[in-house]
Every structure is written in structure tokens, then in C-alpha cells.
Design a protein with these regions (language model features):
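Short, small-residue-rich loop/turn micro-motifs
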Residues: 84, 143-145
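Extended terminal and domain-junction accessory segments
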Residues: 1-136, 178-185, 189-215
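Short strand-edge motifs at loop-to-beta-strand transitions and within beta-strands
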Residues: 7-11, 161-165, 171-177
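Beta-strand signatures of extracellular beta-sandwich domains
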Residues: 138-140
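Solvent-exposed beta-strand/loop surfaces of large extracellular or lumenal domains
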Residues: 1-5, 149-166
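Low-complexity, intrinsically disordered short segments enriched for Gly/Pro and polybasic residues
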Residues: 77, 142, 162-164
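Short aromatic-acidic-glycine turn motif
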Residues: 145-155, 210-214
Length: 215
């Protein structure tokens, strides 16, 4: 399991083994800014007589219904390019300006407006002459979740619902979203917080169908 910042997962550990101390290990990996050495996450002590406990045979049913989005129902396709510019102008102390669609975060700017009830497909890529191919970024969006359709050429299992996903270098990630909830302004951003805080974030506005656009 590769977890980007803000990813969550659940797993079971089967304790049906000899008594002793067992370690849960985080494996070494080198996914750009997620690079880390192998380390012990925790130690588990198994003791006493074995217990006869049945293990689940299937995943639990979701507690939230998220109907899948059909291609013919997609209202709009958007592309978000995560990149950077050297040397940093807005962030000279960092040395790089982090950008989405070649734009650094502006508090009052709302470059993306979506209509409540619409279903959209977003293509997420890492780009830029200096930035592309050197690192990935975890995309996180507020207020809604998305279905992951493809990571590169690999189609994902139907119903893979997330709100944060790692965009590997040189790879396009395709997601679909249904915009439900209430009107208002919110954000999406890179969840490596120093990247977010130095520009890799954008506002987007949810509006009622046929209603005025205020921001």
C-alpha cells in the first residue's frame, strides 16, 4: 500500500502465529517527495492460547452510496497540471514557485466554477520544463470525493473512491467527480503542505444550477 500524505486505509493483521514479538514494517520506497527508508511502525506481541476467530470473507458494505459515473453522463472534462517555476519569484526563500495550471494561489481568484449536480472528469498530471518528471504530488479536494478511473494506462477497479491521490511523475491520473452538497467556495491543492503553502492550491466555486455566480 503506497499512501500519500492525507491518504487513509484499513487493514487486518492475523494474529494466528507462534507467540512472540512481531513487527509491522514500512518498506523503503522512493516515490520522489515520499522517499523514505525502511522503519518499524509498531511491534505486536502475540501470547496465550490461540483463539478460534473467523476472518471476514468480504469487504464491509460502504456506509455511503456513491453511484458510479457513466462516460455518457460527463458534463465536462478538465485538466490540472501541477508544476513549478525556477527560480522562485513569489517564493525566493524556497527557490521554486509551485503552480497549478501555471498559476500560483491567489486568495481572491476562482479559476474553476462547477455546477452542483454536474458530473465531471478531471485529468491530473505533473508538468513543467523543470518540474515534470522529477517529483509527484498528492492531489486533495475538499467537499467532494472522486472515483479513480485510471493511473497511467492501468484501469482501476470500479468504485475506487478517494479524496486524495498520488500523481506519480510522468503519469496522468483520471478521476470522475459528482458535485453534490451546498453552494460556496472551497479548494483543491497538493497535500505536501509546504507545496500548498507556497502556491500549489486553487479555489473553486460550487454554484446552484441556473443561479448567479458569486465569489
Amino acid at each position: 500500500m503506497l499512501l500519500a500524505p492525507a491518504n487513509r486505509t484499513e487493514f487486518l493483521i492475523n494474529g494466528n502465529a507462534r507467540p512472540g514479538i512481531y513487527r509491522v514494517i514500512q518498506l523503503a520506497q522512493d516515490q520522489q517527495f515520499l522517499e523514505s527508508a525502511e522503519k518499524v511502525v509498531c511491534e505486536i506481541e502475540i501470547a496465550g492460547a490461540p483463539m478460534d476467530m473467523g476472518l471476514p470473507t468480504a469487504l464491509p458494505r460502504p456506509n455511503r452510496y456513491y453511484p458510479l459515473i457513466k462516460p455518457q453522463d460527463i458534463e465536462r472534462v478538465r485538466t490540472l497540471e501541477f508544476g513549478g517555476a525556477f527560480p522562485g519569484v513569489a517564493n525566493p526563500w524556497v527557490g521554486i514557485d509551485f503552480l497549478i495550471n501555471n498559476m500560483q494561489y491567489q486568495v481572491e481568484a476562482v479559476p474553476t466554477v462547477v455546477t452542483l449536480g454536474d458530473e465531471e472528469e478531471w485529468h491530473l498530471i505533473v508538468s513543467g520544463p523543470h518540474h515534470g518528471g522529477t517529483e509527484g504530488h498528492p492531489f486533495h479536494i475538499h467537499e467532494v470525493s472522486f472515483e479513480v478511473i485510471k493511473i497511467g494506462d492501468a484501469a482501476q477497479p470500479p468504485g475506487t473512491i478517494m479524496d486524495t491521490i498520488w500523481i506519480p511523475k510522468d503519469t496522468e491520473v483520471v478521476v470522475r467527480m459528482r458535485f453534490i452538497g451546498w453552494p460556496g467556495k472551497t479548494v483543491f491543492h497538493c497535500h505536501i503542505l509546504p507545496h500548498e503553502d507556497t502556491g500549489m492550491m486553487q479555489n473553486f466555486l460550487l454554484v446552484d444550477p441556473g443561479g448567479p455566480v458569486h465569489h
